[in-house]
Amino acid sequence: GATGSTGDIGPTGATGSTGDIGPTGATGSTGGVLDFADFYALMPPDNAATVAAGGDVDFPRDGPFSGAGIARTGADTFNLSEIGSYQVLFQVSVTEAGQLVLTLNSGAGAVELAYTVVGRATGTSQIVGVALVQTSVINSILTVRNPASESTALTITPLAGGTESVSAHLVITRLR
């Protein structure tokens, strides 16, 4: 004879037991700092008496660093070997009012990064700057500069506040 009609769906069965735990997944990449370097100067004797308008500050000594990804190419020029985001901190003691700016050369000449200009109107304290810099090509060159638009040279202050040499620092950290 003919096949009969399909019957009603029955009730859901009881939940089964939990299966075995699967294998551990691969370890992910480490987060945080990818590379860092500290460059510094002692005054005296490491910098010229003045840094002319449009001139770069020297940081001729090497502090702690993590590898070759951030390296000097001269006393005042620093290679950022990877495309990425970098946190840049710098401090320099100067005698007069003035400004400093970061420059980045990505192959077409050094460009002053206007968003990194820092300065002070009076006094003889340090000029301190902090900025994030994004590179778009490998081997970009970074400097700390007395802006070309300034009318006066900056005097790097030796022995500020006492008898010991005063340090200036440039710390570069690659974040991604």
Question: Where in the sequence are the language-model features?
Answer:
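Low-complexity/repetitive intrinsically disordered segments
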Residues: 1-11
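Extracellular jelly-roll beta-sandwich "head" domains, especially the C-terminal globular C1q domain
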Residues: 11, 20-176
